[in-house]
Amino acid sequence: MIRPRFALLAACLLLTGCGSGAVASTGHAPGAPADPGTPTTSAAVASSPAVTPSPEMSAQGAPLNLPGLGPKTRAQVPADARQAVVVTGRGKNSPRSTVVLYRRTAEGWHADATWPAHNALKGWSDHHMGNDLRSPIGVYGLTDAGGLLADPGTRLPYHHSHGFVSPGTGFEGEPLAGSFDYVVAINYNRKPGTTPLDWTRPLGAKRGGGIWFHVDHGGPTHGCVSISERHMKDLLRALDPALHPIAVMGDAKSLAR
């Protein structure tokens, strides 16, 4: 039985941030959707602007800093973060991006997985607002998860609820059903330690919210980052609260600042 309160909250998320609830307006022609089941190739990564700084390497050959981040972005990375999900957009106005899961050891940062992804329809923003159809640039904690389907084996707190519904169609006419089968809340304008469906907005409702990692539906989102269902399960199983995981997200040029 769907609990009305959580179903209403999920519907609100669709309108304000988590990117799946609106039919595309005419006049938009976003790029072709990513193939969520195909690993990212070096050619795809090379399509990003060549602005990424060269990372310092440890004696063991691992980067000492997260690759692609400039000093401004690196300064936002907490000292205790030992797991990072880096989302690098192909351009400031592009809905296509690449997700790399990193783990920090004594030798440096190691890339454990690379996945194709979608972000918001209009790309990225340094000052995200509700309904601007851009994903927020920044560094955010990853503390809470949930979904319509049962916990696949994550170590994060997991809220299994029928409130994670995603009706309707996306910007390219694709069905949104199943988009919220698995989600990880990105701690932009939300209260950490609560269900992803929680409606607390510390920056105010106008700044949007409900920014999640969720299952890809084959097109751009309202503000979230989406990857294939298989990769969402991989992400959920990999994230470890003891490693203080974070999301680092933005277009390549912005992250390199």
Model feature map: region roles:
Residues 1-11:
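N-terminal export and membrane-targeting signals
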Residues 16-17:
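C-terminal motif of bacterial Sec signal peptides marking the signal peptidase cleavage site
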Residues 21-214, 237, 252-257:
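Cell wall/extracellular polymer interaction/catalysis modules
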Residues 211-212, 218-257:
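Extracellularly exposed regions in secreted/surface proteins, prominently low-complexity, repeat-rich
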